[in-house]
Amino acid sequence: MSVYQKENPEYLRAAVESVLGQTVPPEEVVLVCDGPLTEALDGVIAEYVRQFPENSEEIMNLRESGLQGNGLSENDQQGDTCQQGKIQGKNPQESQRQENSNQKVIFHVIRLTENGGLGKALNEGLKHCSCEWIARMDTDDLSAPDRCEKQLKFLEKHLEVDALSGTIAEFQGDALDGKTAETAVISYKTVPETQKEIAAYIKQRNPINHPCVMFRKSRVESAGGYQPCPYFEDYDLWVRMYKNHAVFANLPDTLLYMRINGMHQRRGGIRYAKCVIDFRMKMYRDRVITFGEFLPMTVVRVLVSLMPNSLRRFLYEKKLRKQQ
């Protein structure tokens, strides 16, 4: 997970809780702070540092940054008085999480001195992941409670798969839990399920839902990790993995609730259109697509990016997405 200063602290807390509340919880959570954060965001992170006191390096970093006002007493900063009652008082969802599993989760916080963008932050996070299988997530989304369980069960039966995602439920608003988000869902982003379908789909559109993907760390690293490719860092990664004969799959199940507040505006404008052309040209130069495959979809995507926001929003929600 990667967080930067413009994100909502309540969304961050809800996202982390949706990870820690999984029916099959993770062994570790790696949170990359992409540059300096606001005091409110640092306060949320401090809550989890307090809940996982073995992460003493982060506690020291917080103390050196002068963040003692975020609810850390001197004893809390030393990591030796993380009592159950105090945790429940600071974060009521903690008691429910402990009912789900007694497994101890390791919580890593990695701080970058400057904001370098999502790709750079995720590459740094990869270095600190000790597990071969990594579940990705954005810090303003909500994972379905059984997301990891479903993905791991599938992967146990399909050992050849290197990256697995699934359906995303898109919603608008300030929901802080899956049940509330479900009532605000306006569309579903589905992706093809089999390798054969994905091999055809990847030439035209992104075949993997990045916010809910689970992938092999070694496969991502062997493909070069995330590389500079504005707006398309994840798509570019899947293309390079595909060229390296990686095996992909997607589940039909809804694995994640994704906030799309303002998404359609971000996918428009001249700069975005230029990035579309550059990325599609890269695919053509790398012989992933032919010129006949390059031209029609590139023209369509450029035209969509130059549409008025309201028209582009209608197109995404009514034509390019599965309706509720």
Each model region followed by its residue ranges:
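Short, well-formed alpha-helical segments that are part of the catalytic scaffolds
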Residues: 7-21
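Acidic donor-binding segment of Leloir-type glycosyltransferases
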Residues: 20-111
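Glycine-rich, basic loop-to-helix element that forms the pyrophosphate-binding segment
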Residues: 111-129, 150
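Short aromatic/hydrophobic "clamp" motif used to bind/position activated sugar donors
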Residues: 134
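Conserved donor NDP-sugar-binding/catalytic core segment of glycosyltransferases
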Residues: 146-184
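Catalytic beta-strand/loop signature of glycosyltransferases that borders the donor
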Residues: 167, 248-255
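Acidic donor-binding loop at a coil-to-helix junction in glycosyltransferase catalytic cores
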Residues: 231-237
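Catalytic core of nucleotide-sugar-dependent glycosyltransferases
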Residues: 246, 258, 266-290
